[in-house]
């Protein structure tokens, strides 16, 4: 049989990685299918721990490497929950680094395949809103609108978590404002404001109040074309850091 690996302390992470990788090699060489499956499952969690540690330390490159290994192992092990976590974190890390195509790939995989498996409404809201930002940056405003509207419809029917819907309303209002559709912008920012007020989150409420004021001013005086608050990415980053993964 393949060797077993039982690290005794957190400091033994490197040894655990080496041991589980060796365990996988032995199992693979001898076609021990049950041991291979167990090794992949163990590596899934070990790689996840390494990636999360690197992300916390601020080493984006090392974190992405760890999450990539974690994702590969999770897919081989059939662990949909950890695979979803890896897609979400990789998407957010790429987004933070400005790598929109990579962020789009991982966040779309999370939204389409992983959100249901993970069952984390906060992460689901952040992923939808961040993916919409990626689509907007690539010029696909229509795709961004469709994504956000579908998310709001789903969230409104199935969730009491409202930070995600608040950010989605903010994103939709921003898109409509940029397109010159002042009435729709006001409608979305009013909804954003109502949700923000119910949440009692001062940072989100300040953004909602400012954006609604700008949109109403634009509706009354079309020549008043001020920009709405541009700190949505920061709000997304702030909220993502609180996603319960």
Protein language model annotation of sequence segments:
Residues 22-32, 68-75, 79, 108-117, ...:
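Amphipathic alpha-helical segments of tetratricopeptide repeats
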């Amino acid at each position: 049989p393949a060797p077993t690996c039982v690290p005794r302390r957190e400091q033994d992470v490197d040894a655990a990685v080496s041991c589980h990788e060796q365990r996988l090699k032995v199992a693979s060489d001898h076609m021990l299918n049950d041991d291979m499956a167990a090794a992949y499952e163990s590596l899934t969690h070990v790689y996840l721990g390494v990636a999360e540690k690197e992300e916390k330390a601020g080493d984006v490159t090392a974190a992405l490497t760890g999450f990539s290994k974690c994702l590969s192992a999770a897919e081989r092990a059939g662990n949909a929950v950890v695979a979803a976590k890896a897609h979400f974190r990789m998407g957010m890390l790429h987004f933070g680094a400005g790598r929109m195509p990579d962020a789009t790939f991982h966040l779309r995989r999370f939204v389409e395949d992983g959100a249901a498996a993970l069952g984390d409404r906060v992460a689901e809201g952040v992923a939808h809103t961040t993916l919409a930002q990626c689509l907007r940056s690539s010029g696909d405003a229509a795709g961004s609108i469709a994504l956000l509207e579908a998310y709001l419809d789903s969230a409104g029917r199935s969730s009491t978590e409202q930070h995600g819907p608040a950010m989605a309303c903010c994103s939709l209002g921003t898109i409509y404002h940029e397109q010159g559709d002042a009435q729709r912008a006001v409608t979305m920012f009013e909804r954003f404001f109502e949700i923000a007020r119910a949440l009692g989150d001062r940072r989100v409420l300040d953004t909602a109040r400012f954006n609604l004021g700008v949109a109403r001013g634009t509706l009354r005086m079309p020549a008043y074309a001020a920009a709405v608050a541009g700190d949505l990415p920061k709000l997304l980053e702030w909220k993502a850091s609180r996603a319960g993964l």
